[in-house]
Every structure is written in C-alpha cells, then in structure tokens.
UniProtKB/Swiss-Prot annotation:
Its main location: membrane. One of its GO terms (biological process) is ubiquinone biosynthetic process. This is 4-hydroxybenzoate octaprenyltransferase. It comes from Burkholderia cenocepacia (strain HI2424). Its EC number is 2.5.1.39. It is found in: Cell inner membrane. The lineage of its organism: Bacteria, Pseudomonadati, Pseudomonadota, Betaproteobacteria, Burkholderiales. Belongs to the UbiA prenyltransferase family. The chain crosses the membrane at residues 41-61, 89-109, 133-153, 158-178, 202-224, 266-286. It is a multi-pass membrane protein.
Length: 287
C-alpha cells in the first residue's frame, strides 16, 4: 500500500494544485463577502480543506470516467489509472473516501449547508460524464467548481441570497473561459476520440468565446463591486484581473498547445487578484 501511495497522490493531482486554487478563490470570495470581511477561522479551515478534498475526489472520479479515452490523449496517457498502474476500483474507492471525509467536515455546520453539500456532491460526481452529452461541459464544471459559493453564504448567513447565485453565474463564465483554454490543448486528440468540449463547439470562434466569457465574468464583478459599494482597493484588484485576461489573449490567439496551457494555469493569478481586492477592501474599511 505504501508503495502505491505516490500513485494515489498523482491520481488526485496533489502534484498539480492549480485546480484546487481555481475552486478555492471563488469560495474565499464568497466567505469574505458573506461575513463582511470577517470570516470565522473554523469556516476558513472547513472550506479550505473541503475544497482540497472534493477537488481530489473529482480528479479520481474524472480519471475513472475517462479511463478509456485518456489512453488516446498525449497529455493523459501516462496517468496512473490510464496506464494500468492502479485499478478502476481503487480510483472509485478513493473518490468515495475523500468525499466522505469532506462531508464529515461540514457536520458541525447548519442544515442548509449540509443540504447544499448533497447537491454539490451530485454535480461534482456527474460532471466527468457530461462530456458525452453536453456541447459545452465546461459550463457544468463551473457549477461544480463554484458550488462552494452558495454553501459559504449558507454557512455564514443560513440563507443563500441572490448575490450568491450571481457570483455562481460569474464562476460559470470564468470556468468556461479557463477550461476552454485547457481544452484547446487537447483539441486534436478530442476530435479523434469524439469527446465534446467547448473548444470544439466554439470552433474558429474559440478565442473570441474565451474573451467574451472573461468579459462576462469581470462585468458581473463590476456589478458586485458597485452594488456592495467597494472602494479603491477592490477596483485595483479588478483592474489586475482585467490585465490577466488581456494577457491570456496574447497566449491563446495563435491556438498553440503550450501557450494555451500556460493561459489556463495563469488563471490562478486572475482569481487571486480578485480575491486580494475583496480582502483588501474589507481590511482597509476596518472590517
């Protein structure tokens, strides 16, 4: 078992934390806004660990669902499950075990948060199979990656206001943007094996679609900033996020594999500066 532990870590992408951060930034945004800049430390610990666990569980489930496709994709052919180094039942067991631990974390929280966690689990577990049916499965991913937003509001306020759902919509647009960049890396392989992705659906308009999704995301955050009366610190963070999005255009405009992958990875900075703007606003406002 100990000899297989490094394989399990690779299965859940512990060597690639970018995915966890893409889940964590929107969740932290929601925690800070829901608590007026004063989130309780227990909630921060619960949601941070829960994000890491559920992202890891999702990776294991994704590899299980895609095991027959991944062997035909250059980037994924050497994954532990695809290459036969671990078995399918092990991936499922890890996904179930990590999900159970994540659920244990939220047991001290209110009933609404626990009810929402069931929905979140269903969405996260079903996402890997959406590539067989949906033309833009990345939109479904945005729901899965963003469900920490309504859960955070529920945990803090025991209700989910309209603002939380608006933030979730922003996250859906952001997910379509960055995961389309990711899908542009595998475009040729995905055409061969018949998987549906937003990069294929958008076709020659893929770059324009990515930039439109960034514009929608950042436009919603303009509405959030104006509605909540955020100050200069927030707008500096927002402007930095705009700069990140414009930089991504320079990376993806020629549709080359490695620059597209670099753009995907750089979304950690886009999410990070948005959160920094929110946190800085509350800090400077005395909260």
């Amino acid at each position: 078992m100990l000899a297989r532990f490094p394989l399990y870590l690779r299965l859940v992408r512990m060597d690639k934390p970018i995915g966890s951060l893409l889940l964590l930034w929107p969740t932290l945004n929601a925690l800070w806004i829901a608590s007026d800049g004063r989130p309780r430390w227990p909630l921060l610990v619960i949601f941070t660990l829960g994000t890491l666990l559920m992202r890891s569980a999702g990776c294991a489930m994704n590899d299980y669902a895609d095991r027959d496709f991944d062997r035909h994709v250059k980037r994924t052919a050497d994954r532990p499950l695809t290459s036969g180094k671990i078995r399918a039942w092990e991936a499922v067991a890890i996904a179930v075990g990590l999900s159970f631990i994540a659920f244990l974390l939220i047991l001290p929280l209110n009933t609404l948060t626990k009810e929402l966690s069931v929905v979140a689990l269903f969405v996260a577990g079903s996402y890997p199979f959406m590539k067989r049916f949906f033309a833009i499965p990345q939109a479904y991913l945005g729901i899965a990656f963003g469900f920490g937003i309504p859960m955070a509001f529920a945990a803090v306020q025991d209700t989910v206001p309209m603002l939380a759902w608006v933030m979730l919509v922003a996250n859906i647009f952001w997910s379509v943007a960055y995961d389309t960049e990711y899908a542009m890396v595998d475009r040729d392989d995905d055409i061969k094996i018949g998987i549906r992705t937003s990069a294929l659906t958008f076709g020659r308009f893929d770059v324009a679609a990515v930039m439109a999704c960034y514009a929608a995301t950042l436009g919603i955050y303009v509405w959030i900033g104006v509605t909540l009366g955020f100050g200069l610190a927030y707008w500096v963070g927002w402007a930095a996020a705009v700069g990140c999005a414009l930089y991504h255009y320079t990376l993806i405009k020629d549709r080359e594999r490695m620059p597209c992958f670099a753009a995907f990875r750089h979304n950690n900075w886009l999410g990070g500066v948005l959160f920094a703007g929110i946190a800085a606003h509350y800090l400077l406002a005395g909260n």
